[in-house]
């Protein structure tokens, strides 16, 4: 009997459908087609989402800056390394030691990352521009601070800005060490600065600074390096979906004018599917005197050396350099 009723209902539905106008038939067909498309897409989405949860154990190794600082890395960048007290310390001392004047100072932040330094400078009343060679970093900066100025640019390209464009230039958080040609960097900064302008650069004692990233310091304001018999060079952090590990390696015998001598290798392991992503940061870590001699050779004058120990960055410094008037 159920089959008979089904056939009877189907015939009834067909008779009703056959008596409708051509327009109604078209609309019924269109609605049916849309339902089919939606059901197909829904199934596809569910399959793709499910497949991402399967164990794939893929391995990726990145050494290029644009590949390292991709959308994923940028999304967790603050969780790994951001420390507001350090940023405030850097900007505060820049203001203190470099004669900054609200609205008249025009600052370039090289290696602006996700934009926090530019935001802080703007909050203090200064004009500021951030540049970075990572498209993902620039996109994130513009998304977070849409009212501020960020550009995808390389500090080693002298044509990026006109001569005498800025009163101040900053280069914080190891940015300078990613550059092989430091002479060109200082030449470009000299060209872009106004006469009497200031350049603030972050330099470290490469043999003693703490390579543990902020996220991996379980003691917060106390560095475990002070109590370790041997320098700690590894960091391990567990996030919700990823395990993070990093290891710093320094080779002092390498000529940094030719090749990198320091490496920070980061490993991200996806807890759910076993995927592994590795980043190898290649750094040209010349000594502080070597770098300062390059700066002096293009005409810079060293004005101040600021110890960052106050913000828990032992053996790290901000140097304030000045272009002659």
Model-inferred region functions:
Residues 203-292:
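SAM-dependent methyltransferase
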Residues 111-113:
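Class I SAM-dependent methyltransferase "Motif I" SAM/SAH-binding loop
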Residues 115-158:
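Class I SAM-dependent methyltransferase SAM/SAH-binding core
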Residues 183-195:
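A short glycine-rich, Lys/Arg-flanked "PGG" loop and its adjoining helix->strand segment in the class I
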Residues 37-102, 116:
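Conserved class I S-adenosyl-L-methionine
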Residues 196-203:
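Conserved beta-strand signature within the Rossmann-like core of class I S-adenosyl-L-methionine
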Residues 282-325:
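C-terminal lobe and adjacent flexible extensions of AdoMet/dcAdoMet transferase-like proteins
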Residues 160-169:
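A short acidic, Gly/Pro-enriched loop at the edge of an enzyme's catalytic core
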């Amino acid at each position: 009997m159920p089959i008979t009723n089904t056939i009877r209902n189907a015939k009834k539905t067909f008779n009703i459908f056959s008596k409708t106008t051509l327009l109604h038939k078209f609309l019924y067909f269109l609605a049916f087609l849309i339902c089919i498309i939606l059901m197909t897409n829904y199934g596809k989405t569910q399959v793709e989402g499910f497949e991402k949860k399967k164990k794939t154990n893929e391995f990726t190794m990145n050494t290029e800056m644009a590949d390292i600082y991709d959308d994923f890395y940028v999304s967790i960048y603050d969780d790994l390394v951001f420390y507001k007290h350090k940023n405030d310390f850097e900007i505060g001392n820049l203001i203190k030691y470099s004669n900054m004047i609200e609205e008249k100072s025009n600052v370039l932040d090289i290696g602006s990352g996700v934009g926090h330094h530019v935001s802080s400078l703007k909050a203090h009343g200064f004009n500021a521009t951030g540049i970075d060679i990572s498209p993902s970093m620039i996109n994130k900066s513009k998304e977070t601070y849409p009212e501020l100025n960020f550009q995808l640019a390389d500090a080693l390209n002298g044509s990026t800005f006109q001569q005498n464009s800025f009163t101040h230039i900053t280069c914080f958080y190891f940015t300078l060490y990613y550059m092989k040609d430091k002479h060109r960097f200082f030449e470009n900064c000299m060209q872009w600065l106004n006469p009497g302008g200031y350049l603030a650069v972050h330099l470290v004692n490469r043999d003693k600074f703490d390579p543990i990233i902020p996220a991996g310091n379980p003691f917060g304001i106390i560095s475990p390096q002070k109590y370790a018999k041997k320098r700690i060079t590894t960091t391990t952090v567990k996030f919700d979906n990823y395990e993070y590990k990093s290891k710093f390696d320094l080779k002092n015998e390498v000529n940094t004018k030719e090749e990198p001598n320091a490496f920070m290798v980061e490993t991200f392991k996806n807890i759910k599917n076993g995927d592994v992503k590795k980043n190898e940061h290649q750094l040209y870590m010349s000594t502080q005197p070597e770098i300062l001699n390059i700066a002096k050779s293009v005409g810079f004058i060293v004005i101040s050396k600021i110890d960052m120990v106050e913000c828990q960055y032992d053996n790290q410094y901000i140097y304030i350099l000045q272009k002659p008037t």
